[in-house]
């Protein structure tokens, strides 16, 4: 489902430092030249944002219950949101996926590659999105808050 409460033009209005937003499919929101082929905010997707300087995005609405919010992921790369309201060790946060993914990356270049015991991400954090490479179809269900 897509949120009809938060079209990009409204959601990002307060972010003067925003340059561009990109989703997993390559669609973009580029306010300076009036391009929005993403549509409305989808809380089941993660996004990449390029800013000229740090800023805070405030979103109003109901809190998501992560344990009741499945995210279906097909084979390949995805940008996933972290739906919990507190940090959690990545191995527990992604436990519902078992062995269906190969690697997870954050926006700082850290990785989680469980097959060879690498975890430089540590905890997943609220407000962050992560790249994940799925080996096959599975459903991500985060533990409850």
Question: Where are the regions a protein language model picked out?
Answer:
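N-terminal exported-region signature
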Residues: 9-145
């Amino acid at each position: 489902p897509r949120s009809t409460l938060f079209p990009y033009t409204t959601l990002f209005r307060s972010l003067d430092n925003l340059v561009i937003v990109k989703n997993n499919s390559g669609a973009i929101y580029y306010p300076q030249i009036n391009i929005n082929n993403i549509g409305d905010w989808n809380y089941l997707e993660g996004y990449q944002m390029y800013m000229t300087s740090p800023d805070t995005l405030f979103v109003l609405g109901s809190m998501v219950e992560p344990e009741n919010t499945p995210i279906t992921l097909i084979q390949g790369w995805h940008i996933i949101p972290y739906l919990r309201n507190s940090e959690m060790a990545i191995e527990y946060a992604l436990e519902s996926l078992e062995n269906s993914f190969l690697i997870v990356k954050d926006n700082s270049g850290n990785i989680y590659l469980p097959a060879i015991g690498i975890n430089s991400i540590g905890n997943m954090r609220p407000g962050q999105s992560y790249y994940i490479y799925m080996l096959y179809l599975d459903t991500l269900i985060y533990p409850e808050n």
